[in-house]
Amino acid sequence: MTSKPTQDRHRAKRLALSDPDEALRLARDIEDHWFRCQALALVAFRCESDTLRATAITESFQAGWELGAVNRVVVASSWPLKVLCKKGGAERLEDEVRRLLAIIDTDRSPVRRAESLDFVLGALITAPRELFWQAYEQLEEACRAPLHGGKRNVKGEALLVQWMPVLHAFDPARAEAALAAIQGPVLAERARATIAQNPSVNPEKWIPRPSLD
């Protein structure tokens, strides 16, 4: 059975075009911070009023902040961040990227940092390229960072492999450099095969997270 927060998020999304004020009210009333953050972002993405959109984005980031744990704050905030990318607001986008990257940097776990940055980078696929690469550099660092006791970060390397077709589409030379640094030959070969099989990849379809659908 679908939970009430999930149902209310879907209802708010559906109402955003036909009754944006009611959609905003419904999204605001969701008690769960995670679902409220997403619902407000979905309303912001679909509504036609610039004023209402700006309000919903601000409240969405606030709901994300209220989650407390660094990785949950950042992952949830990737939803309103993606709305900023898709609907304009370049100056605010830069401010929010700077804020979120600073928050991520406080997490000592490279695994959690990589998981958070994966969503941030997904939100920034349509952003100005310099912002994308700024987030990517932190993702790459987290994915390559050794785990406790110096263990190889296999999970991080596997995440980088997922991003290789997008990197290759944006900057083939940078993708090659990233491939060369992957320690595992099996993962590196998988990445090369994925790139070869998807020469004209659509970055947004390849990495759909966070989803605004």
What are these regions (language model features)?
Residues 1-213:
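Non-catalytic tandem-repeat scaffold regions and their flanking low-complexity/translocation tails
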